[in-house]
């Protein structure tokens, strides 16, 4: 059962929260907390409910995310909770706005990259700025933010700060470990809260995802869920067209489901989208299909994805973080990297953790793909 105030978004009501989640929600306003937990443990849900708690206390909070797709997702949920639509923001948008209000002008950047903010230069300037007004901040997917950002946050000293992070989902070039976040924010070890249970996946999906977990990382594998389901499967299809026909047929047979299609390469993404769209127009015109590509003139609006509603969403790997779908398809898995590096395994860990019910791997090769070798015994070859 989901909260009826949240059309399309599966947001549990307060009475449906677990004991560990309720304990987090009951932490006093004015706390500085670090919450760790793997995919499906409810980190984003807890950020939303704590933001709602602050609103009831007449305190307006801001929830920062790293990518626009997750921002669009949480914006929909926030509006349904009665939170202002501007309560959610990407990290970069917030940083530019905050710098303009604090110092005037654009923030200093490094290497002629507008997204690589020079937080150390900002830290030096903060010594000359009066004390900041009260701020209530939640940071989701905090492992994707640079550690220098947290050092500046420590100087700003928000009135209430909660960081949600999973070290095993660091798939961006600039990132932070759990220990780096804790140290930068001077958070006591006792104020690090760990969420353990997986509320999203079926057990077969969670078992596959766990095979791509990188050992020796502070954020652990979640407790395996009890919910049973179908075994994730690999389908060897001869061409991209056949992969797209497979996806379209599935969507036609399951019109009420939200389906995520993940593509590794950005240059391949429009081909996959156009191929599926063409099949839909020919055979299933009632199915909705959307795509998000950052910076693209036609498909650069994450809000247009209508996250949480039925239909097909075509995304690339970098937009996967924080999302969830009923069913997920990974296309071209036979051309993916072979997970010889931790970054490749982390990406697969993130992708395999997105579906609630069904996970399909599609490729052109008849041989079992090297990219899935870690979970070969858990994946059915159809």
Residue ranges and their predicted role:
Residues 5-100, 131-132, 136, 143-382:
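Conserved helicase motor core of SF1/SF2 NTP-dependent helicases
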Residues 113-136:
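Mid-core helix/loop region of P-loop NTP-binding domains shared across ATPases and GTPases
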Residues 94-116:
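Conserved P-loop NTPase mechanochemical-coupling segment
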């Amino acid at each position: 059962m989901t909260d009826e105030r949240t059309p399309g978004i599966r947001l549990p009501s307060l009475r449906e929260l677990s004991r560990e989640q309720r304990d987090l929600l009951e932490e006093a306003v004015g706390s500085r907390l670090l919450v760790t937990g793997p995919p499906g443990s409810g980190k984003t849900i807890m950020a939303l409910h704590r933001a709602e708690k602050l609103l009831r206390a007449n305190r307006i909070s801001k929830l920062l995310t790293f990518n626009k797709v997750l921002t669009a997702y949480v914006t929909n949920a926030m509006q349904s909770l009665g939170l202002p639509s501007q309560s959610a923001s990407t990290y970069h948008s917030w940083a530019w706005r905050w710098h303009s209000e604090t110092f005037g002008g654009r923030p200093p950047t490094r290497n002629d990259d507008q997204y690589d903010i020079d937080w150390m230069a900002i830290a030096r300037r903060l010594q000359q700025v009066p004390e900041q007004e009260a701020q209530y901040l939640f940071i989701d997917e905090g492992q994707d933010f640079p550690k220098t950002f947290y050092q500046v946050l420590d100087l700003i000293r928000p009135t209430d700060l909660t960081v949600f992070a999973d070290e095993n989902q660091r798939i961006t070039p600039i990132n932070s470990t759990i220990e780096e976040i804790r140290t930068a924010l001077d958070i006591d070890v006792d104020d690090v809260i760990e969420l353990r249970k997986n509320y999203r996946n079926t057990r077969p999906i969670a078992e596959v995802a766990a095979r791509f977990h990188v050992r020796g990382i502070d954020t652990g594998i979640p407790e395996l869920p009890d919910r049973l389901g179908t075994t994730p499967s690999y389908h060897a299809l001869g061409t991209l067209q056949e992969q797209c026909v497979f996806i379209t047929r599935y969507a036609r047979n399951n019109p009420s489901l939200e389906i995520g299609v993940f593509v590794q390469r950005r240059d391949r993404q429009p081909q996959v989208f156009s191929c599926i769209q063409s099949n839909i127009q020919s055979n299933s015109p009632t199915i909705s299909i959307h795509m998000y590509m950052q910076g693209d003139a036609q498909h650069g609006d994450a809000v247009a994805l209508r996250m949480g509603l039925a239909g097909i969403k075509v995304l690339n790997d970098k937009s996967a973080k924080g999302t969830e779908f009923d069913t997920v398809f990974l296309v071209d898995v036979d051309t993916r990297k072979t997970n010889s590096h931790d970054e490749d395994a982390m990406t697969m860990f993130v992708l395999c953790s997105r579906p609630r019910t069904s996970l399909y791997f599609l490729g052109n090769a008849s041989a079992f793909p090297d990219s899935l070798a870690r979970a070969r015994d858990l994946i059915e070859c159809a």
